[in-house]
Structure formats: structure tokens, C-alpha cells
Design a protein with these regions (language model features):
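Generic structural motif
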Residues: 22-24, 101, 134-136
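Short N-terminal edge-element motif at the start of the domain
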Residues: 80-108, 122-123
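N-terminal start-of-chain detector that recognizes signal peptides
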Residues: 65-70, 94-103, 111-117
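N-terminal auxiliary "cap/dimerization" subdomain that precedes the catalytic jelly-roll/cupin core
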Residues: 1-85
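Functionally constrained cores in energy, signaling, and assembly domains
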Residues: 21-23, 79, 97, 110, ...
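A structural signal for short, well-ordered beta-strand segments and their strand-loop junctions
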Residues: 16-19, 88-97, 128-132, 141-144
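Catalytic core of non-heme Fe(II) oxygenases with the double-stranded beta-helix
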Residues: 106-145
Length: 145
């Protein structure tokens, strides 16, 4: 993005932000935190991943978050803000998700449907940022609303 260019209006569109994965090496951090060399092969370490196992893995990431807190701060304030504009606040620590092939622990949904009686004018100001740590394609991804 060049100086003077307009920031993306993400209220009605999805945006893919490309970034330097070597500089922001979230993959190595997650692999180390979960005790695996190849994160995309994590599913091979378990016979059948239960909800308890998935929760355990997400807690491992949350417990190790301080190791990358500064890196995530820089990522948000440089990479994300360069596209969306200044970031007033963000969830810290973020929500970590671990998904295994063939397992789904929540029904198909849209986030906006889960907000119930919350003022939707406030909710619209929030943005979900998804940072996949393994390759994604087709139905190995998220539906972007």
C-alpha cells in the first residue's frame, strides 16, 4: 500500500493480507508450543482427537502466548493496521483454535448469529482476523461472511 492510499473498508468485504511468514513466524512458535516439528502433521500424533484433547492443545497455545505477545502486537499494528487503519484495541490473548480433519465441535454458523441481543452497531466495528498456521484450501478453510 502506498502513502496516501485509502484504507480498505472491511465492513462489507473480506480482505486477504499477505505478510512475511519468516518475520512473523507464528508457525514455529505454535509447533514448539504443541511439541511437534510439523504442525500440519499434528493429527498423526493422536488416534482420535477428542474435545478434551482439542481444548488441551488450545490451552497449551494460550499458556505460551507471552512468548509471541510482542510479535503479535507488531503484526497487528504494522501489517493489519496498514490495511484496515489504526487498531484501537484487540483481544489479548487471542482465541486459539485447533481443528483436526473430520472433527467439528460446533455447528456451522455465522459469528453475527451468535451475538444475540448485543447491539449490532457495536459488533460491526469488530473484525475477525484469521491467521492460519497450515496451508488452507477448499473445505480446509473458513467460510468468510
Amino acid at each position: 500500500m502506498t502513502k496516501g492510499s485509502q484504507k480498505k473498508d472491511c465492513n462489507s468485504e473480506s480482505v486477504i493480507i499477505r505478510y512475511d511468514t519468516k518475520r512473523y513466524d507464528f508457525l514455529s512458535w505454535a509447533s514448539h508450543s504443541l511439541g511437534t516439528r510439523e504442525l500440519h502433521q499434528l493429527h498423526q500424533q493422536f488416534n482420535y482427537p477428542s474435545l478434551e484433547m482439542v481444548n488441551h492443545l488450545m490451552n497449551l497455545l494460550k499458556n505460551q502466548f507471552e512468548e509471541i505477545n510482542g510479535l503479535l502486537y507488531t503484526f497487528i499494528n504494522k501489517e493489519i493496521a496498514s490495511v484496515l487503519g489504526p487498531i484501537a484495541s484487540y483481544q489479548n490473548p487471542p482465541s486459539f483454535r485447533v481443528h483436526f480433519h473430520g472433527t467439528g465441535f460446533t455447528p456451522f454458523h455465522r459469528d453475527r448469529d451468535w451475538h444475540g441481543k448485543i447491539d449490532m452497531n457495536i459488533v460491526r466495528r469488530f473484525r475477525n482476523i484469521w491467521i492460519p498456521l497450515t496451508k488452507v484450501w477448499g473445505n480446509n478453510s473458513l467460510l468468510i461472511e
